Amino acid sequence: MLSRLGALLQEAVGAREPSIDLLQAFVEHWKGITHYYIESTDESTPAKKTDIPWRLKQMLDILVYEEQQQAAAGEAGPCLEYLLQHKILETLCTLGKAEYPPGMRQQVFQFFSKVLAQVQHPLLHYLSVHRPVQKLLRLGGTASGSVTEKEEVQFTTVLCSKIQQDPELLAYILEGKKIVGRKKACGEPTALPKDTTSHGDKDCSHDGAPARPQLDGESCGAQALNSHMPAETEELDGGTTESNLITSLLGLCQSKKSRVALKAQENLLLLVSMASPAAATYLVQSSACCPAIVRHLCQLYRSMPVFLDPADIATLEGISWRLPSAPSDEASFPGKEALAAFLGWFDYCDHLITEAHTVVADALAKAVAENFFVETLQPQLLHVSEQSILTSTALLTAMLRQLRSPALLREAVAFLLGTDRQPEAPGDNPHTLYAHLIGHCDHLSDEISITTLRLFEELLQKPHEGIIHSLVLRNLEGRPYVAWGSPEPESYEDTLDLEEDPYFTDSFLDSGFQTPAKPRLAPATSYDGKTAVTEIVNSFLCLVPEEAKTSAFLEETGYDTYVHDAYGLFQECSSRVASWGWPLTPTPLDPHEPERPFFEGHFLRVLFDRMSRILDQPYSLNLQVTSVLSRLALFPHPHIHEYLLDPYISLAPGCRSLFSVLVRVIGDLMQRIQRVPQFPGKLLLVRKQLTGQAPGEQLDHQTLLQGVVVLEEFCKELAAIAFVKFPPHDPRQNVSPAPEGQV
């Protein structure tokens, strides 16, 4: 009974409520907006204080409600047809450009965004929609730093979302005007796909349109308003600007408002990561997307000071594009904000390449390589000015540390090292930049040498097989460093004693210092004939004579600590190279192959030369040289094992290895310490100074003493690396648990 009564009441209310003519209401609201421009004489009243925002809101609500009431999905209702036929969006775009009344541009952006987002019917294929959309994008692009940035980024967010849903829209939004122009030139109809005859775009004729109320004083499009609009409302098409969605997004990415910039960057990322190959190809071939992104990177680079301290650059390493501002707790220095902006944008470029479609990623990586690496950065790296070399090298190191995308890493490696994979020769002409960087490792300026060595150390940690191949492995192929006809040593007893080593001089034997005692080990060998790991480890540990060792007098400087660290680093390195398919054992020597002279390569040569001068170089430089050599020794390739970490290989005539270089240094040391009075005491004091346990007073022979400390620690580090590596581990297998204790 109650339900029947409720139904009767509902029918009564419905009968008394007048039916709403949506089209009539829609036209009345539009007429109210146009009449404001015809009748109003006050040009100072803000738009938000007029009835324009309310009328636009009513028009939007009518469009949404009409669509919800449509019986057949996908059909345009009378109000939407009216919007399309009478080019309301184009008129609004013109009003927004005039910025009359003040704040009208903001209202137009909001209306466009809400219509495109809330109306489900596909709109962007229509000429009367995507043409004003393009105009509005160009309008936003001309207002850098304007008060409408928030509305502009919301507008681009809607567009990027629509493009992601339908990648075909990209062509219409980016270059719809040009498409229409080409069609007109060819005599083709201007109706774009999905236009229908019932609501196609027309100039002024309303043939085929549903009957509608006559709007008093109305004429076609914006013509009724022309006599009442300021002079600056001429058509945007007349300009020569090429602004579009890409340039608008890039402009918003540079906003001072962090939220606006971040949202614009996210929108651009959404655009380039579309899965459609056709859209990706169009983005690369028919838009200025990649050049514009790289152009901004180059501009940010040029905006930095000519000289930046590498230590200052290091404080900002790791800046993310999501948080590009410099940390407030860091010390300020000239150019800090410019540096933070550059590193943040480079990180964004790297992230774009990582997430983008392969077609876009490759094109953007090549653009970065050609326009930034080669044209902008390389001249600074090759400059004669030490300040330019220092700053550009430190910046390149910071960029490498941030670099994650495989495509950009591939381009960076080719830029730095070239593409030649043949073994090097002493007199060849290597890749220009590579040759300069190698020369910088042995520069007269110790600071440049240290900075360049840091660059190579960072490069060695990147997951690209071409790096270690170009620097080291291509010269070790075929094992030409091994003496022909020399059998592998079967035990320690078969190896050359230090006393018989030709690198030692008679003065060393007569110096009164004892040579390293031979370890009392069983002549055990590993399963493949290699010298037992214990013998190799002790060879490095016993290399520095007891008279030149001081670590035993201090805590936490033992070999165990190095083993623990080496295990973690080796595990990380093995994981990085696991997919490179390296062999587990050295390549067998081929007796039928002609013997070729061995050259360790330009990179190892400069490292060995630096290592041979360890007793005469600054402490910080020695630390960096040994750090790079340790990184090399960690690689789980059998030829690197053999050449850098096996003291018992029979070297070919004229060849040197890391161990033989160390033996020469020890020979030189044993001669020089005779001339240093109170050598053991001074050496211990220097070690305490380096560890902060003693005041840093200046001593005689301080460089020599610091070099001895580094030498001892480096030998322990090599012993630890050998311990965790030998017998060679399969880089495709997990390494065993970290060993404890000392060998």
UniProtKB/Swiss-Prot annotation:
Expressed in which tissues: Expressed in liver.
Xref: Pfam families: DUF5917, KELAA, RAI16-like
Annotated region (Disordered), positions in chain: 186-219
Domain of life assignment: Eukaryota
Biased amino acid composition, Basic and acidic residues: 196-206
Family per similarity comment: Belongs to the FHIP family.
Function per UniProt: Able to activate MAPK/ERK and TGFB signaling pathways. May regulate the activity of genes involved in intestinal barrier function and immunoprotective inflammation. May play a role in cell proliferation.
The protein's name: FHF complex subunit HOOK-interacting protein 2B
Lineage: Eukaryota, Metazoa, Chordata, Craniata, Vertebrata
